[in-house]
Amino acid sequence: LLFVLISVAANGQQAKYVFYFIGDGMGVNQVNGTEMYQAELQNGRIGVEPLLFTQFPVATMATTFSATNSVTDSAAAGTALATGKKTYNSAISVGEDKNPIETVAEKAKKAGKKVGVTTSVSVDHATPAAFYAHQADRNMNYEIAVDLTKANFDFYAGGGFLKPDKTYDKKDAPNIFPIFEEAGYTVARGYSDYKAKSKDAGKMILIQEEGKDPSCLPYAIDRKSDDLTLAQITESAI
């Protein structure tokens, strides 16, 4: 996000889109290792082959401890990335006092922008959830999914939903998909279904086809021709 805004300011141009990419667990070592591997692919060259984003005009470092732990988890890290505030491990965009913290995505929506949240894992996973939900525990998957409708963003996409009809305290609950539809969302299962429905849809939720693992998209090495991909999700969001 910072990179896009600074580049626009430097060039005096108006940005059509702002993309905020998060590599979950992707630290300096992972990036450097990838650049070394890219160089190795070039006839065994020693050194690094820079990735596109490491050549952006601005880069910075961030601390990775949470408010309560030396090692953060995805929930506290996602909250920090979404709100700029540190919180306790397992928190989804709430502070240590359990009160909600407004996210950058919510600010964009209030400013009249269209907003989408996409992921390669489940839509109710801690990292994407931190941008639209406010819950005391990352495992409150059903409650997080309900918050999706409250945020009222324009597009959500990912593997699926982990607990579509079971609350955090393991009680039966109304299935989440009719709730989505009542809130004005068109649910598409798979890329073909998305293409068939998107022309007549307003707000949309794109997930994998029925029967596929909702926890994440298939890894590239295991991917079948009809599996939903992150590239398709990104194209759909745009």
Name every feature range the model reports, one short phrase each.
Residues F3-N11:
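Hydrophobic h-region of N-terminal signal peptides that target proteins for export
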Residues Q13-S198, G202-K203, E210, L228-A231:
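N-terminal catalytic scaffold of extracellular/periplasmic and nuclease hydrolases
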Residues E210-L217, D222-K224:
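Membrane-embedded hairpin module used as a gating/binding unit in multi-pass transport
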Residues A220-I238:
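Accessory "access/gating" subregions that flank catalytic or transport cores
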